[in-house]
């Protein structure tokens, strides 16, 4: 029986962990960029066998757990390390009376989906990720939404974490002018605008699209808002497939996975 344990990561673990967080996606990985923020937030769990071979970050809010950044050293795949890390994160959530656990998995990632299924996570919703290029664009008419129905936004995305909305959360967002809408011919598109806490100059938008004309209004506003406020990129997350719009680029689809803990 070889020595192994789960513990909180520390500053000195960085290099040994980043070694296996290099080529996760075709473009690389984001772990290096968020490393110090996640360390500050705490609950960055590390699986150690002589040296670190896996990590997973958990974010606890209201009554939910958000699980993110599961990375396993390729030499230690199929050792159930991901499952053990997730189960550990859940156990801390349960002690603190959290009711649900969520994670986001690329719809093509069969291994992660079966790992989540084996831990009783269900495919709850599908979300699509688009990027939009910031640029000067005055071709819009939008309004700030004063009161928004939680049926339009059951979740909003805060720094790539799907947070279940409450009346209070939506009221706070609208009082900060973070919720915009375009309303034409009885159809409307709404968007919640946020910053990516861990990566600079990135606008994250949760979008609910009603028609092409209202969508165009909102996308044009977002482009211009990002341009005027020196954002480098706009990341849009939505349940629907969006129609063609200049410099809107479909990236990838995800399953929002959900597990009840009670």
Residue ranges of predicted features:
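Conserved acetyl-CoA-binding loop-helix of GNAT-fold acetyltransferases
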Residues: 72, 78-91, 114, 213-224
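A conserved beta-strand-loop-helix scaffold within acyl/acetyltransferase catalytic domains
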Residues: 22, 28-45, 54-70, 191-200
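Glycine-rich acetyl-CoA-binding "A-motif" of GNAT/NAT acetyltransferases
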Residues: 50-54, 111, 188-190
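Conserved N-terminal entry element of GNAT/NAT acetyltransferase domains
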Residues: 1-11, 134-147, 262
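Conserved active-site alpha-helix within GNAT-family acetyltransferase domains
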Residues: 83, 107-125, 240-252
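Conserved catalytic-core motifs of GNAT/GCN5-like acyltransferases
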Residues: 60-63, 102-104, 122-135, 249-261
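Conserved GNAT acetyl-CoA-binding A-motif
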Residues: 93-108, 228-238
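Amide-forming acyltransferase catalytic core, primarily the GNAT-like/NAT-type
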Residues: 119-199
């Amino acid at each position: 029986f070889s020595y192994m344990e789960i513990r909180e990561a520390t500053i000195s673990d960085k290099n040994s962990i980043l070694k296996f967080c290099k080529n996760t996606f075709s473009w690389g990985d984001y772990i290096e960029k968020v490393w110090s923020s996640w360390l500050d937030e705490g609950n960055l769990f590390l699986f150690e066998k002589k040296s670190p071979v896996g990590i997973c970050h958990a974010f606890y809010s209201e009554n939910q757990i958000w699980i993110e950044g599961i990375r396993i050293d390729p030499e230690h795949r199929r050792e159930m390390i991901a499952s053990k890390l997730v189960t550990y994160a859940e156990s801390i959530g349960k002690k603190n009376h959290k009711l649900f656990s969520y994670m986001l998995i690329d719809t093509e990632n069969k291994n992660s989906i079966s790992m989540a299924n084996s831990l009783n996570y269900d495919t709850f919703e599908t979300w699509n990720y688009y990027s939009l290029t910031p640029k000067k664009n005055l071709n819009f008419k939008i309004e700030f939404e004063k009161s928004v129905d939680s049926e339009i936004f059951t979740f909003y995305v805060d720094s790539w974490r799907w947070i279940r909305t409450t009346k209070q959360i939506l009221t706070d967002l609208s009082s900060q002018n973070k919720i915009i809408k375009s309303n034409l011919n009885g159809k409307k598109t709404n968007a919640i605008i946020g910053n990516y806490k861990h990566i600079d100059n990135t606008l994250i938008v949760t979008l609910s699209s009603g028609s092409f004309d209202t969508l165009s209004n909102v996308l044009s506003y977002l482009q211009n808002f990002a341009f005027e406020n020196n954002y480098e990129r706009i990341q849009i997350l939505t349940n629907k497939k969006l129609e063609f719009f200049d410099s809107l680029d479909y990236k990838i689809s995800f399953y929002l996975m959900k597990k009840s803990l009670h």
